[in-house]
Amino acid sequence: HDPHPVYQAFMAQDYSENFSRDEVRQTVIPTYMGLIQQLDNHIGRVLAKLDEKGLRENTLVVLTSDHGDYLGDHWLGEKDLHHDPSIRIPLIISDPSDAADSTRGSSSDALVEAIDLVPTLTEYAGAKVCSERMEGRSLTPLMQGGLPSGSWRDYIISEIDYSDRGPRTLLNLHPYDCRARVIRTRQWKYVLHERFRPQLYNLLDDPNEF
């Protein structure tokens, strides 16, 4: 069957066509990995300086990103759509408090969102979390072993806006119609597009979202 119209419009962009070429991927992906190595080295410098200044034991360190990158996966470039290479981001938190000893060095498969960071940092700063204004949830219970990851959240939400992107012209859309909303559970991902048919992925049977 034909690709989804929005997906097809993004695949038709110059950057997607370029990233889909094997010779480009063979050049860009190692370069991208090298940049990650460079970032890792600089993070090491920051942590070493915290140790040198005696600040490591009372400093909360958070490493995250605002988006991923396709790098040619799904025949796409950049970061624009709903697949996991774009919306699934790293989140590493070093909590020096004694309360986090039980989870130190571990990983969690809990469904968390970027908006969870604001209430988390607010709570760590000793300020009141205004739940009526903050949509996220403090991650402290997960980080300090007070809550199993499976009971944390049933779904997460992501939103897409491509009103300033090339596909808007190809699809002849009003800017207000260049939006999609994504709901993801552990098993399912549902993408609701303005003006176009929705998409549904069973992530257990189709983890690569094809």
What do these predicted regions represent?
Residues 67-73, 115-118, 123-199, 203:
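C-terminal cap/loop subdomain of S1 sulfatases and analogous C-terminal strand-loop tails that border
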